[in-house]
Amino acid sequence: MKIVLAESLGFCYGVNRAVEATKRLLKEKRDARVIGDIVHNEIVMKKLKDMGLKVYPDLSSIDFSDTAENSVAIIRAHGASPDVEDFLKRRFGYVVDLTCPIVYNVFSLAKDLEKKGYFIVIFGKKDHAEVKALCGRLNDYLIVEPGYDFETIKAFLREKKPKKVALISQTTMNSESFEKLAEKLLKLEGIEVSVNNTICNVTINREKMAIHLAQTCDAVVVVGGKRSSNTGKLAKIVESHGKRAFHVQNPEQLPDLSIYRKVGIISGTSTPKEQILKILDYIKFTYEGEVIRNGGEV
Protein backbone atom coordinates (compact mmCIF):
# COMPACT_ATOMS: atom_id res chain seq x y z
CA MET A 1 0.00 0.00 0.00
CA LYS A 2 1.13 3.54 -0.76
CA ILE A 3 0.24 6.18 1.85
CA VAL A 4 0.12 9.73 0.50
CA LEU A 5 0.35 12.61 2.98
CA ALA A 6 -1.28 15.94 2.20
CA GLU A 7 1.13 18.84 1.76
CA SER A 8 -0.14 20.52 4.93
CA LEU A 9 -1.17 18.72 8.12
CA GLY A 10 -1.96 19.63 11.71
CA PHE A 11 -2.97 22.86 13.40
CA CYS A 12 -3.36 26.14 11.56
CA TYR A 13 -1.77 29.25 13.10
CA GLY A 14 -4.89 30.40 14.95
CA VAL A 15 -5.60 27.03 16.55
CA ASN A 16 -1.96 26.46 17.52
CA ARG A 17 -1.82 29.92 19.08
CA ALA A 18 -4.96 29.27 21.15
CA VAL A 19 -3.92 25.80 22.31
CA GLU A 20 -0.36 26.78 23.26
CA ALA A 21 -1.52 29.91 25.12
CA THR A 22 -4.04 27.84 27.08
CA LYS A 23 -1.36 25.30 27.97
CA ARG A 24 0.91 28.08 29.24
CA LEU A 25 -1.84 29.42 31.50
CA LEU A 26 -2.50 25.96 32.90
CA LYS A 27 1.20 25.28 33.46
CA GLU A 28 1.31 28.56 35.41
CA LYS A 29 -1.42 27.06 37.62
CA ARG A 30 -3.97 29.63 36.53
CA ASP A 31 -7.62 28.76 37.16
CA ALA A 32 -8.48 28.89 33.44
CA ARG A 33 -12.11 28.84 32.29
CA VAL A 34 -13.70 28.96 28.86
CA ILE A 35 -17.18 28.96 27.33
CA GLY A 36 -17.21 26.20 24.73
CA ASP A 37 -14.27 24.19 23.45
CA ILE A 38 -10.99 25.97 22.71
CA VAL A 39 -10.95 23.93 19.48
CA HIS A 40 -13.36 21.35 18.05
CA ASN A 41 -11.16 18.35 18.76
CA GLU A 42 -12.13 15.91 21.47
CA ILE A 43 -8.61 14.59 22.07
CA VAL A 44 -7.10 18.07 22.44
CA MET A 45 -9.90 19.14 24.77
CA LYS A 46 -9.48 16.07 26.99
CA LYS A 47 -5.79 16.88 27.44
CA LEU A 48 -6.57 20.50 28.33
CA LYS A 49 -9.25 19.44 30.80
CA ASP A 50 -6.83 16.94 32.36
CA MET A 51 -4.43 19.87 32.83
CA GLY A 52 -7.17 21.74 34.71
CA LEU A 53 -9.14 23.71 32.11
CA LYS A 54 -12.77 24.27 33.12
CA VAL A 55 -15.19 24.28 30.19
CA TYR A 56 -18.75 25.60 30.34
CA PRO A 57 -21.42 25.25 27.62
CA ASP A 58 -22.74 28.80 28.11
CA LEU A 59 -22.61 31.87 30.36
CA SER A 60 -25.41 30.72 32.64
CA SER A 61 -23.56 27.53 33.54
CA ILE A 62 -20.42 29.25 34.89
CA ASP A 63 -19.87 28.57 38.58
CA PHE A 64 -18.55 31.74 40.21
CA SER A 65 -18.65 30.36 43.75
CA ASP A 66 -15.13 28.96 43.50
CA THR A 67 -13.39 31.71 41.52
CA ALA A 68 -10.05 32.80 42.94
CA GLU A 69 -7.49 35.55 42.45
CA ASN A 70 -5.76 33.43 39.83
CA SER A 71 -8.98 32.80 37.84
CA VAL A 72 -8.78 33.74 34.17
CA ALA A 73 -11.41 33.68 31.42
CA ILE A 74 -10.39 32.59 27.94
CA ILE A 75 -12.03 33.73 24.72
CA ARG A 76 -11.51 30.86 22.31
CA ALA A 77 -10.22 30.90 18.73
CA HIS A 78 -13.74 31.28 17.30
CA GLY A 79 -14.21 34.58 19.14
CA ALA A 80 -17.08 35.79 21.30
CA SER A 81 -19.80 38.41 20.95
CA PRO A 82 -19.20 41.83 22.58
CA ASP A 83 -21.87 41.03 25.19
CA VAL A 84 -20.01 37.89 26.23
CA GLU A 85 -16.67 39.72 26.23
CA ASP A 86 -18.08 42.49 28.46
CA PHE A 87 -19.61 39.95 30.84
CA LEU A 88 -16.33 38.08 31.23
CA LYS A 89 -14.39 41.30 31.82
CA ARG A 90 -16.83 42.29 34.57
CA ARG A 91 -16.74 38.92 36.33
CA PHE A 92 -13.08 37.99 35.94
CA GLY A 93 -10.05 40.04 36.82
CA TYR A 94 -8.16 38.73 33.82
CA VAL A 95 -9.43 37.85 30.32
CA VAL A 96 -7.23 36.34 27.61
CA ASP A 97 -8.58 36.88 24.10
CA LEU A 98 -7.41 34.04 21.84
CA THR A 99 -9.64 34.91 18.90
CA CYS A 100 -7.91 33.87 15.68
CA PRO A 101 -6.54 37.03 14.00
CA ILE A 102 -8.12 35.98 10.70
CA VAL A 103 -11.51 35.57 12.37
CA TYR A 104 -11.13 38.94 14.08
CA ASN A 105 -10.42 40.56 10.71
CA VAL A 106 -13.75 39.20 9.46
CA PHE A 107 -15.49 40.76 12.47
CA SER A 108 -13.89 44.13 11.71
CA LEU A 109 -14.70 43.93 8.00
CA ALA A 110 -18.36 43.14 8.67
CA LYS A 111 -18.70 46.08 11.06
CA ASP A 112 -17.06 48.44 8.55
CA LEU A 113 -19.33 47.27 5.75
CA GLU A 114 -22.40 47.75 7.93
CA LYS A 115 -21.28 51.29 8.77
CA LYS A 116 -21.03 51.97 5.03
CA GLY A 117 -24.69 51.06 4.61
CA TYR A 118 -24.42 47.45 3.50
CA PHE A 119 -26.86 44.79 4.66
CA ILE A 120 -24.71 41.83 5.70
CA VAL A 121 -25.34 38.35 4.30
CA ILE A 122 -23.33 35.67 6.12
CA PHE A 123 -22.59 32.33 4.49
CA GLY A 124 -22.18 30.01 7.45
CA LYS A 125 -23.79 27.82 10.09
CA LYS A 126 -26.01 29.68 12.53
CA ASP A 127 -25.01 27.48 15.48
CA HIS A 128 -21.27 27.78 14.85
CA ALA A 129 -19.40 29.74 17.52
CA GLU A 130 -17.70 32.02 14.99
CA VAL A 131 -21.01 32.98 13.38
CA LYS A 132 -22.59 33.67 16.77
CA ALA A 133 -19.66 35.92 17.69
CA LEU A 134 -19.95 37.73 14.35
CA CYS A 135 -23.72 38.25 14.60
CA GLY A 136 -23.28 39.75 18.06
CA ARG A 137 -21.39 42.62 16.42
CA LEU A 138 -24.04 43.46 13.81
CA ASN A 139 -27.36 45.27 13.96
CA ASP A 140 -29.02 43.33 11.15
CA TYR A 141 -27.99 40.39 8.99
CA LEU A 142 -29.08 37.26 7.15
CA ILE A 143 -27.40 33.89 7.72
CA VAL A 144 -27.36 31.63 4.67
CA GLU A 145 -26.61 28.02 5.58
CA PRO A 146 -25.50 25.18 3.27
CA GLY A 147 -28.46 23.68 1.45
CA TYR A 148 -30.19 27.06 1.22
CA ASP A 149 -33.15 27.80 -1.07
CA PHE A 150 -32.17 30.85 -3.11
CA GLU A 151 -35.80 31.72 -3.86
CA THR A 152 -36.32 32.16 -0.11
CA ILE A 153 -33.29 34.47 0.02
CA LYS A 154 -34.65 36.51 -2.90
CA ALA A 155 -38.04 36.82 -1.19
CA PHE A 156 -36.37 37.96 2.04
CA LEU A 157 -34.34 40.63 0.23
CA ARG A 158 -37.38 41.83 -1.72
CA GLU A 159 -39.17 42.43 1.56
CA LYS A 160 -36.09 43.92 3.24
CA LYS A 161 -35.37 46.19 0.26
CA PRO A 162 -31.66 46.85 0.95
CA LYS A 163 -29.90 49.09 -1.58
CA LYS A 164 -26.54 47.46 -0.86
CA VAL A 165 -25.69 43.90 0.21
CA ALA A 166 -22.30 42.61 1.37
CA LEU A 167 -21.61 38.88 1.31
CA ILE A 168 -19.07 37.48 3.78
CA SER A 169 -18.38 33.97 5.02
CA GLN A 170 -17.60 31.93 8.08
CA THR A 171 -13.88 31.27 7.68
CA THR A 172 -14.20 27.48 7.43
CA MET A 173 -16.92 27.18 4.78
CA ASN A 174 -16.55 25.50 1.40
CA SER A 175 -15.07 28.02 -1.05
CA GLU A 176 -16.82 26.58 -4.11
CA SER A 177 -20.21 26.83 -2.38
CA PHE A 178 -19.42 30.42 -1.41
CA GLU A 179 -18.61 31.34 -5.01
CA LYS A 180 -21.87 29.80 -6.24
CA LEU A 181 -23.85 31.88 -3.74
CA ALA A 182 -21.91 35.01 -4.73
CA GLU A 183 -22.67 34.38 -8.40
CA LYS A 184 -26.40 34.19 -7.67
CA LEU A 185 -26.41 37.34 -5.55
CA LEU A 186 -24.53 39.30 -8.20
CA LYS A 187 -27.31 38.56 -10.68
CA LEU A 188 -29.95 40.26 -8.52
CA GLU A 189 -31.30 43.41 -10.11
CA GLY A 190 -31.50 46.72 -8.30
CA ILE A 191 -29.06 45.78 -5.52
CA GLU A 192 -25.39 46.71 -5.26
CA VAL A 193 -23.59 43.54 -4.15
CA SER A 194 -20.15 43.48 -2.54
CA VAL A 195 -18.56 40.01 -2.45
CA ASN A 196 -15.96 39.46 0.29
CA ASN A 197 -14.47 35.98 0.35
CA THR A 198 -13.44 35.73 3.99
CA ILE A 199 -12.75 32.00 3.94
CA CYS A 200 -9.34 31.32 5.49
CA ASN A 201 -6.61 30.60 2.92
CA VAL A 202 -5.40 27.64 4.98
CA THR A 203 -8.81 25.97 4.74
CA ILE A 204 -8.99 26.76 1.01
CA ASN A 205 -5.60 25.09 0.51
CA ARG A 206 -6.77 22.05 2.49
CA GLU A 207 -9.80 21.83 0.20
CA LYS A 208 -7.48 21.76 -2.83
CA MET A 209 -5.39 19.05 -1.18
CA ALA A 210 -8.51 16.99 -0.45
CA ILE A 211 -9.50 17.22 -4.13
CA HIS A 212 -5.97 16.23 -5.22
CA LEU A 213 -5.95 13.20 -2.90
CA ALA A 214 -9.41 12.17 -4.09
CA GLN A 215 -8.20 12.33 -7.69
CA THR A 216 -4.99 10.38 -7.09
CA CYS A 217 -5.84 7.90 -4.30
CA ASP A 218 -8.29 5.02 -3.88
CA ALA A 219 -9.52 6.31 -0.50
CA VAL A 220 -8.70 9.15 1.90
CA VAL A 221 -8.42 9.12 5.69
CA VAL A 222 -9.53 12.47 7.12
CA VAL A 223 -8.20 12.94 10.65
CA GLY A 224 -9.98 15.25 13.08
CA GLY A 225 -12.75 15.90 15.56
CA LYS A 226 -16.29 14.90 14.72
CA ARG A 227 -17.54 18.40 15.63
CA SER A 228 -14.93 20.17 13.51
CA SER A 229 -16.60 22.07 10.66
CA ASN A 230 -13.50 22.23 8.48
CA THR A 231 -12.63 18.54 9.00
CA GLY A 232 -16.11 17.35 8.11
CA LYS A 233 -16.00 19.57 5.04
CA LEU A 234 -12.84 17.81 3.80
CA ALA A 235 -14.52 14.41 4.08
CA LYS A 236 -17.49 15.67 2.06
CA ILE A 237 -15.19 17.09 -0.63
CA VAL A 238 -13.44 13.73 -1.03
CA GLU A 239 -16.76 11.90 -1.31
CA SER A 240 -18.09 14.47 -3.78
CA HIS A 241 -15.21 13.44 -6.05
CA GLY A 242 -16.26 9.80 -5.97
CA LYS A 243 -13.84 8.37 -3.40
CA ARG A 244 -14.37 6.90 0.06
CA ALA A 245 -13.51 9.23 2.94
CA PHE A 246 -12.96 7.87 6.44
CA HIS A 247 -13.36 10.65 9.02
CA VAL A 248 -11.64 9.27 12.12
CA GLN A 249 -10.10 10.45 15.37
CA ASN A 250 -8.04 7.36 16.23
CA PRO A 251 -6.83 4.09 14.62
CA GLU A 252 -9.62 2.10 16.29
CA GLN A 253 -12.18 3.89 14.11
CA LEU A 254 -10.53 2.82 10.85
CA PRO A 255 -12.17 0.10 8.74
CA ASP A 256 -10.23 -2.61 6.93
CA LEU A 257 -8.12 -0.76 4.35
CA SER A 258 -6.55 -3.84 2.73
CA ILE A 259 -8.64 -3.47 -0.45
CA TYR A 260 -6.99 -0.11 -1.23
CA ARG A 261 -3.65 0.20 -3.01
CA LYS A 262 -3.22 3.94 -2.42
CA VAL A 263 -4.58 5.79 0.62
CA GLY A 264 -4.34 9.53 1.26
CA ILE A 265 -4.16 11.18 4.67
CA ILE A 266 -5.33 14.73 5.37
CA SER A 267 -6.36 16.55 8.53
CA GLY A 268 -8.52 19.41 9.66
CA THR A 269 -6.90 22.57 11.02
CA SER A 270 -7.84 21.63 14.59
CA THR A 271 -6.04 18.27 14.48
CA PRO A 272 -2.70 17.94 16.34
CA LYS A 273 0.16 16.23 14.55
CA GLU A 274 0.50 13.53 17.22
CA GLN A 275 -3.06 12.43 16.45
CA ILE A 276 -2.20 12.15 12.74
CA LEU A 277 1.05 10.32 13.51
CA LYS A 278 -0.76 7.60 15.48
CA ILE A 279 -3.04 6.90 12.53
CA LEU A 280 -0.18 7.07 10.03
CA ASP A 281 1.91 4.61 12.07
CA TYR A 282 -1.04 2.23 12.41
CA ILE A 283 -1.71 2.17 8.66
CA LYS A 284 2.00 1.94 7.83
CA PHE A 285 2.68 -1.04 10.10
CA THR A 286 -0.66 -2.83 9.62
CA TYR A 287 -0.53 -2.75 5.83
CA GLU A 288 3.25 -2.49 5.32
CA GLY A 289 2.67 0.87 3.73
CA GLU A 290 5.15 3.02 1.85
CA VAL A 291 4.81 6.67 2.87
CA ILE A 292 4.83 9.25 0.08
CA ARG A 293 5.30 12.57 1.81
CA ASN A 294 4.21 14.78 -1.11
CA GLY A 295 5.61 17.74 0.80
CA GLY A 296 3.68 16.75 3.93
CA GLU A 297 5.43 16.12 7.22
CA VAL A 298 4.13 14.80 10.55
Curated annotation (Swiss-Prot):
It holds the Pfam family LYTB. The active site is at residue 130. Signal peptide: none annotated. Binds 1 [4Fe-4S] cluster per subunit. Its EC number is 1.17.7.4. Keywords: 4Fe-4S, Iron, Iron-sulfur, Isoprene biosynthesis, Metal-binding, Oxidoreductase. (2E)-4-hydroxy-3-methylbut-2-enyl diphosphate binds at residues 40, 78, 128, 171, 228-230, 270. [4Fe-4S] cluster binds at residues 12, 100, 200. It catalyses: isopentenyl diphosphate + 2 oxidized [2Fe-2S]-[ferredoxin] + H2O = (2E)-4-hydroxy-3-methylbut-2-enyl diphosphate + 2 reduced [2Fe-2S]-[ferredoxin] + 2 H(+); dimethylallyl diphosphate + 2 oxidized [2Fe-2S]-[ferredoxin] + H2O = (2E)-4-hydroxy-3-methylbut-2-enyl diphosphate + 2 reduced [2Fe-2S]-[ferredoxin] + 2 H(+). Its cofactor is [4Fe-4S] cluster. One of its GO terms (biological process) is dimethylallyl diphosphate biosynthetic process. CDD domains: lytB_ispH. GO terms for molecular function: 4 iron, 4 sulfur cluster binding; 4-hydroxy-3-methylbut-2-enyl diphosphate reductase activity; metal ion binding. Pathway: Isoprenoid biosynthesis; dimethylallyl diphosphate biosynthesis; dimethylallyl diphosphate from (2E)-4-hydroxy-3-methylbutenyl diphosphate: step 1/1; Isoprenoid biosynthesis; isopentenyl diphosphate biosynthesis via DXP pathway; isopentenyl diphosphate from 1-deoxy-D-xylulose 5-phosphate: step 6/6. Dimethylallyl diphosphate binds at residues 40, 78, 128, 228-230, 270. Isopentenyl diphosphate binds at residues 40, 78, 128, 228-230, 270. Catalyzes the conversion of 1-hydroxy-2-methyl-2-(E)-butenyl 4-diphosphate (HMBPP) into a mixture of isopentenyl diphosphate (IPP) and dimethylallyl diphosphate (DMAPP). Acts in the terminal step of the DOXP/MEP pathway for isoprenoid precursor biosynthesis. Belongs to the IspH family. HAMAP family: IspH. This is 4-hydroxy-3-methylbut-2-enyl diphosphate reductase. It comes from Kosmotoga olearia (strain ATCC BAA-1733 / DSM 21960 / TBF 19.5.1).
